[in-house]
Amino acid sequence: MRTTIVRSVVSMVLMMVAGLALADEYEAAIRMFKDADASARFFETSYGYAVFPTVGKGGIGVGGAYGKGRVYAQGRYVGDSSVTQVSLGFQLGGQAFSEIVFFEDERAFREFTSGNFEFGAGAGVVVITAAAQAQATTAGSSATVSGGPNNAETMGNRYNKGMATFIIPKGGLMYEATVSGQKFTYTPRN
């Protein structure tokens, strides 16, 4: 029952943002993160990164999020990834955002690409936004999402256990006080 609800909510959110997808959505997302002061320096210092052009998130009591991405190592596209999230707690609404996870070194890259990787509920995320944003962690506690990378303000930007995660909101409205984490899969490029 919960799985059906989560899938339905995520499907609705993904349909809402389907029009945002472009042929070069990965390049556009990477460009947005390179243009944002908070994340730009990580392109020069990281071993690699995983970029998710659109992650759709929604919930009514039970929530979920899903997005497809690509993984890069030393500037080369090396594989594909997906991110999923299931959350429990008070939540209502839907939102879409772009996400990037930087790998500080080869060890962090190997940890992420070794199979199914998870960020716990307390993992921090830096929100790059032109609008007000209360706080963003995978544990929830967000208020509204709007705007984009223009004139961005951020809250801290450093590696945590070899990884640094940033999101740029695309749109939507999500009220939540939830417990959740993100799970990533990785498939090497053929």
Regions found by a protein language model. Give the residues of each.
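Small-residue-enriched, tightly packed secondary-structure blocks
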Residues: 23-190
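Bacterial N-terminal signal peptides that target proteins for export
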Residues: 1-10
